[in-house]
């Protein structure tokens, strides 16, 4: 029936949203006796009642059965939606609306470009720029009109009584512009629009309760936006805040107001602002919370509750949500629009105090913004935008800059920070804290800022200045760390637990309440609580709900005393600073370091799918295709045929540097600007890489370490600054930036260009051995220092020190003692007191280096069993011990050894790996998984990386089996896995025998 009747299909999928069940779907039964049964009309037949039954009146029996049957009906309806309904119904409908929105955008763009009302549209655009942000362009204005066209019929159908389009100030302005444009609409356009409106009425009409309407709007908002306007989502970090978190914040604010200021959210002149309201959840939950006394509700609604939203669709949804909740709570004869909501960019409102808002197209909205700016706001709460900038130029979704706000950050957070890289201080959520802090400072009586936000600031190295300023600017600070950092991996990721925003955000999340009480002087008292390890999202939300407020007796607050470095948690100790720094680029004259200042970050291509591949042939083709497209776009730009490049991710991955090359009309060709090299892309996973100053976004100082593929070197890659656990790995080829998280590479040698080289090239030579001069990466100072400590021991060389560093960095005691320091700075090295211990560390480092560099040549671990159908011809039981000659005698072919994706038989069973449909590896020892590098075991790196993958953006396929084919070794991947198992076991054997490290 659903397949043949769209209206019935919509009815079934609306059942769970409605309280009154649809007449088209009746749940009824037929009794065995003569009684009637149709819904609640069933009455038992006296002849069917057994003798000796409890004496109850027919009316009582009927009442009880009615209750039971009503419960049964609800259960059947729920199952009907689950079993018969389409789980993807609303998601698919949102996707369809997204496609329609794109058609609307194309239609409007055509009309405003060529139509009679072009001048009116320019005035309209000017109004948006004045009300929202000067950066609003024509395309964004067209998008907003399309959003209005989508929103209008949905709200008309859902909220028939509120006449939203007529009552909302911004909606009226949008409708006025659209009516001008619709006068030029073609018949085909009108037909499409009418069909869409009819579809909306069928899908969202007849929902009979406020909760169901809000659920539908929330789902539509999230799914529609992700599908129709992904760049808007990326730019603003649009996510929906769980109500458990919202309620916790609202009740916490009320409790703090009572405790600190002897007032409440309900009191007169306590103005409340949600500067990033989204769909209005904070305001609607505030109205429904019961914290505002009934007699105060209308006053609050009319005068003391304010909110802003930048995205038109979210603004509409917020307004209609707030108005509908208010009218459900306050019974009025007349409709009262909510004038506290503004369509505006919160950050922009304080950029220029003299800025005159648009009075032509958006006069009422402008008046509301002015009214809000004059209000003595005492409470600021909400969910600030999460976005931390576009990932690449392809996104074409740059975050906006705000001169005044950025200046305030520079004067405060950045000035107080010691970190070199301060870019993250300009992330949107940090800007929100700065803006709110300045806004609340305007209220002489003090106030509260309460945000749920990205929680990376709590322990981030770059946010040290931010933390120091919070401590100085507020009297009390409450931080509930909800964790959930899914930019980690392995055990650390599991400890972080579920993501509060589900798939909406991978960052850690925190709830922060900042209290500014003028009566309290000195630095803030900091209250901190960690939600706990290994909790799912549902468990976290349950705990937050149980807490209810910061004043809950269930919440055990820890008083934090920051150290001099600005650490609140995971505080660094004092010993680390007394150790010898690996390298110092800030002070290149500092000689008391281990390495010269030519260490480098790993290769950052910003277009990995294009610049790396398992196949040399595929890499050639990919590079050629992207460069051909680049040169075509460059040429068209230079001739004025196009104004901007085409952002087609299947042709090229644009970055800032490559865009600049195109703007300069610089032609590039594959052979002239780079070369193919072997690169270590991830631990124990080599790729063919394209190495180029032009086509790689950042090569850093790698050309000094690996000038070309001809020059050999060893580098120790250590984890860069960040919240991942420390690890390191040695490499003898160009390492990717993420072979170790944000890796810094410390070299045994570096190469200096020989400017006085002799020109002795023959006709067939391409490069002279005199092009570069090899220099030592280890400093003369550290060599002298170590030798002096050990009685001028001449047997200690720079190479000895290099391997000492590698051995020491594997010491479990070193990693444990300095875990907090290693997240916030590069390693520092102690020199052990005893020469024998020093040499033992160095020898162990050399052993580890041999394993980690020559891992492909290490034989399989004895005892690991390989099972495969082919081996049955060689052994009756189908089993052969890895490493025996019989295994290699088996006739091979590439198809047999191909891998699609390796896996474990089931979760938690790691002694066996299913290699492919024919081959299985068993008896893998537990200790093989103890070797963790860059967040996961070496074995699991092989399993993750050696699988056939297609990049979702470029659609480039990377097949690791191509490496086997091009290296004439069909067994390469299988042998590699067997080798890495042994490498892992041997690594841990060496690590466990390292000398004891005394760190007094």
Where are the regions that the model predicts?
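Class I S-adenosyl-L-methionine
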Residues: 162-171, 175-261, 575-587, 591-612, ...
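SAM-dependent methyltransferase catalytic-core segment centered on the flexible catalytic loop
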Residues: 281-300, 349-451, 456-463, 467-480, ...
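Extended, well-ordered alpha-helical scaffold/bundle regions in very large, multi-domain proteins
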Residues: 149, 162-194, 271-283, 301, ...
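Extended, hydrophobic alpha-helical segments in both membrane/secreted and soluble proteins
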Residues: 232, 241-257, 271-286, 314, ...
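Charged, often flexible domain-edge or linker segments that flank or initiate folded functional domains
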Residues: 10-190, 239-372, 478-482, 500, ...
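Active-site-adjacent bridging/hinge elements
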Residues: 117-131, 216-231, 290-298, 352-356, ...
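Sequence-level detector for compositionally biased, low-complexity segments
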Residues: 394, 419, 435-1000
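Long, K/E/R/D-enriched contiguous segments that form extended
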Residues: 205-249, 258, 263-272, 305, ...
